[in-house]
UniProtKB/Swiss-Prot annotation:
Pathway: Metabolic intermediate biosynthesis; chorismate biosynthesis; chorismate from D-erythrose 4-phosphate and phosphoenolpyruvate: step 5/7. Keywords: Amino-acid biosynthesis, Aromatic amino acid biosynthesis, ATP-binding, Cytoplasm, Kinase, Magnesium, Metal-binding, Nucleotide-binding, Transferase. Monomer. The keyword Repeat does not apply. Its EC number is 2.7.1.71. It is an enzyme of class 2 (transferase). It comes from Nostoc sp. (strain PCC 7120 / SAG 25.82 / UTEX 2576). The gene is aroK. InterPro entries: P-loop_NTPase, Shikimate/glucono_kinase, Shikimate_kinase/TSH1. Signal peptide: none annotated. Catalyzes the specific phosphorylation of the 3-hydroxyl group of shikimic acid using ATP as a cosubstrate. One of its GO terms (biological process) is aromatic amino acid family biosynthetic process. This is Shikimate kinase. Binds 1 Mg(2+) ion per subunit.
Length: 181
């Protein structure tokens, strides 16, 4: 698999709570790649939590920092990168993401909500109707997420290991398509 990928980065996109970080770690280990979570890189670089950045700079300020981090990350190879759920919202980010293979972890709202219900660290979910907010965000982002090279549909019974296996099995078909185009 590593020889097929030739060091190309994997970028995991999808909603908050989709499992990008967990699955990303597993994929990195399987491939012998490094692993980065853009939200963690942002928090380390700014010495602030994502909530603090949202509170101080707003979503637009956070998205700019996120784009700056992604611009730097895409110059490296052999990385599996878990991105923030809204990274797809800025057109400039797509030019960075296209330096690698883009994997969409597509998770239904009910599963996302079950995973995130007790999480108070998500600024976009500080809402009177967090499930409705999730549904709205997913509807807004689905046309963008669907531009990924590979869509992995996740169901409630699947473990992170099973999802990572699904990704590993699907990657060769996408790379063959890319190579033949």
């Amino acid at each position: 698999m590593s020889s097929l990928l030739q060091g190309v980065n994997l970028y995991l996109i999808g909603m908050m709570g989709a499992g990008k970080t967990t699955v990303g770690h597993l994929l990195a280990k399987e491939l012998g790649y490094g692993f980065l979570d853009t939200d963690n890189v942002i928090a380390q670089a700014t010495k602030k939590s994502i909530n603090e950045i949202f509170a101080e700079a707003g979503e637009a300020g956070f998205r700019q920092i996120e784009s700056d981090v992604l611009a730097q990350v895409c110059s490296y190879t052999k990385l599996t990168v878990a991105t923030g759920g809204g990274i797809v919202l800025r057109r400039e980010n797509w030019s960075y993401l296209h330096h690698g293979l883009i994997l969409w972890l597509d998770v239904p709202v009910d599963i996302l909500y079950a995973r995130l219900a007790a999480d108070t660290t998500r600024p976009l979910l500080q809402d009177d109707d967090p499930k409705g907010k999730l549904r709205s965000l997913l509807e807004q982002r689905t046309p963008l997420y669907s531009q990924a090279d590979l869509r992995i549909c996740v169901n409630a019974e699947e473990t992170p290991e099973q999802i990572a296996n699904k990704v590993m099995q699907a990657i060769p078909s996408v790379l063959k398509q890319t190579a033949s185009n």
